[in-house]
């Protein structure tokens, strides 16, 4: 990430600093210190933070603005107003966005991408809440648990759905069925008859609009959650390039 920033600054090109829920242009040293010290009661085997990658498609980026600066400001608005609030809600612990300690960094290039539009956002989200009291893991398999030692949980599918719907509402984006998380999740995990039914619905919708897009890549917002302990990626829900939202 630093390599891209240095190249852009040397060329006098617009560059974004770190941001959180309320502030912009935060120094890297503050980010490191804040995350490294927010580890109360964590075990040595626990991850200190999770890395989340939000990567809109070219079509989605065009809905966010015409210039890199416009798209970057729109991305920060999306993270602050949609993604982090939904992330907090999905723990089912009555948390709000202000309870989540995170830092974001926006970048504009991808080394292996041939797209003209490549803006994306890296989020670093602390394992502990803002008060350094509650452990929060988006990789837990518990979902809204009411009884037992573990209360709450995390519903990743619901997060993806809400993050997608929030994006569409915020940017007035007209998402086609074949672009949706539900479509790709069903195509990946459902029975053959259900997959055929969805394919038929997709084809019917395309014919109705007199548009054929089967040779184009599906639009996608990648949301990659990774435990940054030992640089391992322990959880893999779906890793298809055609999926709207993926966790690694």
Q: What are these regions, as identified by a protein language model?
A:
Residues 1-248:
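N-terminal nicking endonuclease/strand-transfer module with a His-rich metal-binding environment
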